[in-house]
Amino acid sequence: MKVISNFQNKKILILGLAKSGEAAAKLLTKLGALVTVNDSKPFDQNPAAQALLEEGIKVICGSHPVELLDENFEYMVKNPGIPYDNPMVKRALAKEIPILTEVELAYFVSEAPIIGITGSNGKTTTTTMIADVLNAGGQSALLSGNIGYPASKVVQKAIAGDTLVMELSSFQLVGVNAFRPHIAVITNLMPTHLDYHGSFEDYVAAKWMIQAQMTESDYLILNANQEISATLAKTTKATVIPFSTQKVVDGAYLNDGILYFKEQAIIAATDLGVPGSHNIENALATIAVAKLSGIADDIIAQCLSHFGGVKHRLQRVGQIKDITFYNDSKSTNILATQKALSGFDNSRLILIAGGLDRGNEFDDLVPDLLGLKQMIILGESAERMKRAANKAEVSYLEARNVAEATELAFKLAQTGDTILLSPANASWDMYPNFEVRGDEFLATFDCLRGDA
């Protein structure tokens, strides 16, 4: 970590804790800043704030009092989940207090080069794939960012010989000014988080900030399957490397079932460790990064063939009596489940789906359900899911929760079948988040394996 004097003796307000705020507070204190942390969670329910106070850092909890900004703060570091129309943020902007993001703070002190990955879908899987391939090739890749390891914490241990492989959300990118990765990946761009950004155009603009400071000596990897990529590519100074599953491009591409990089065959799609058309895209982006980083083809192929997925994201859990289980609890919308289904033989597949009822009809999912062996349906959206199953002429059973659904699926399954949890719905009708929902699937698998 570079020790810089930019923040020494500067009064800095950390707005919002969580993991990133806690890490930023500790980093800035180490750099000699005079830090105040403000978090909305009450102090007696806030172990992170309590720990910071014990370290001598000033904390103010329970609300975000606008009058706090009457103090002469020289910077604000904003939690990425707090929008720019928050009263505290608006007041800071009105007072012309510079607002930093936690990832940019990490960038300022990083000795290690950065590979940044953003996009609407596939960020976590692609980030993990890239780190795995780089490490398999003898490099030292450190996961950081939106993947659960705050960049401002990881950067404190990183040295010049490391590479920070950083997952970046639109929330983290919207406020960056100096941030410059050496390689950036945009997996795809879909209309998501519009409640935060206001419009698809503003959402894309936030994602596009990943390349704002890049030059021709840096590399930007874009999904050539999307028309928007061609438009965006004309506006960057970075060297663009495209990837595509639909056509041959001057980068990474799929052709006749083989993944290539610039005419060099790397791996067959059927040899990838994770199924689904979206994972072919993730693998192509990974191949592009790996080749730019000097990783040998055989190491790339071996690593991608053994990659078992990320927890809750089309994760291959294991087998019981030659019945394979996949945990895709992260699929909280129709598109994600469609992509998951694309990687399987429907005639040998039992799908567990359903969850929070957001008023969606599932007509778009019907073509992907055709030929399914069975569905197990659960949650508030069950009636709508049943209508989709009926239209696809797929038989189904109902379950009260994921555990019961998994047990039912296992009773119905035969040797060679696959059981897939891919709900196409959010979890909040029964579970606090998709992780808890997926953990119940994993726990049930462990019980079934123990009884087998």
Curated annotation (Swiss-Prot):
This is UDP-N-acetylmuramoylalanine--D-glutamate ligase. Pathway: Cell wall biogenesis; peptidoglycan biosynthesis. Keywords: ATP-binding, Cell cycle, Cell division, Cell shape, Cell wall biogenesis/degradation, Cytoplasm, Ligase, Nucleotide-binding, Peptidoglycan synthesis. It comes from the Bacteria. Its EC number is 6.3.2.9. The gene is murD. GO terms for molecular function: ATP binding; UDP-N-acetylmuramoylalanine-D-glutamate ligase activity. One of its GO terms (cellular component) is cytoplasm. ATP binds at G119, S120, N121, G122, K123, T124, T125. The lineage of its organism: Bacteria, Bacillati, Bacillota, Bacilli, Lactobacillales. It comes from Streptococcus pyogenes serotype M6 (strain ATCC BAA-946 / MGAS10394).
